[in-house]
From Swiss-Prot:
It comes from Bacillus anthracis (strain A0248). It holds the Pfam family CTP_transf_like. CDD domains: NMNAT (cd02165). This is Probable nicotinate-nucleotide adenylyltransferase. Its EC number is 2.7.7.18. Catalyzes the reversible adenylation of nicotinate mononucleotide (NaMN) to nicotinic acid adenine dinucleotide (NaAD).
């Protein structure tokens, strides 16, 4: 059975925090690969202005291209409407029956698990991996594997705000992603 990690998100924009989480879990669990799964429309972000799929995908390709064990999974981008993890993982487990999927989520999402669509059935499809900051306990009634990662306090929303305020984002996201954002005028007021 192959072991593959999946990290989902809008990646608007992708940053070093995403890459750090993926790399730490990859090594901690001896995974074969980590697949980045960009969302079409995340249910918890409906109604929010999201950068185009094309731009988010291009930035994600630039961010992950240097790591041979990172790939991009387009499963959710091929569907219209909200992206529910259960629907996606049902499709992926049918498509890849020889894979044990490890679905990577942040500490904030661990506490949100009881509200996930079809969570009980989803638990039969994936092993959840919760990433925690040092000294932070993940509390959930569901079985999860915990991986402690170094603290790196950056988020896509912080980066969008910094770009709007014309503040530097150097060392927070890959340089090629920065160049793409600046050339395309993303996140300007």
């Amino acid at each position: 059975m192959r072991k593959i990690g999946i990290i989902g998100g809008t990646f608007d924009p992708p940053h070093y925090g995403h890459l750090l989480i993926a790399n730490e879990v990859y090594h901690a669990l001896n995974l074969e690969e980590v697949w980045f799964l960009p969302n079409q429309i995340p249910p918890h972000k409906q109604g929010r202005d999201i950068t185009s799929v094309e731009s988010r995908l291009q930035m994600l390709e630039l961010a992950t291209e240097a790591e041979e064990h990172f790939s991009i999974c387009l499963e959710e981008l091929s569907r219209k409407g909200p992206s529910y993890t259960y629907d996606t993982m049902l499709q992926l487990t049918k498509k890849y029956p020889d894979v044990q999927f490890h679905f990577i989520i942040g500490g904030d999402m661990v506490e949100y698990l009881p509200k996930w669509y079809n969570i009980e059935a989803l638990l039969d499809l994936v092993t959840f991996v919760g990433v925690a900051r040092p000294g932070y306990k993940l509390r959930t009634p569901y079985p999860i594997t915990t991986v402690e990662i170094p603290e790196f306090a950056v988020s896509s929303s912080l980066l969008r705000e910094r770009y709007k305020e014309k503040k530097t984002c150097k060392y927070l996201l890959p340089e090629k992603v920065q160049v793409y954002i600046e050339r395309n005028g993303l996140y300007e007021s």
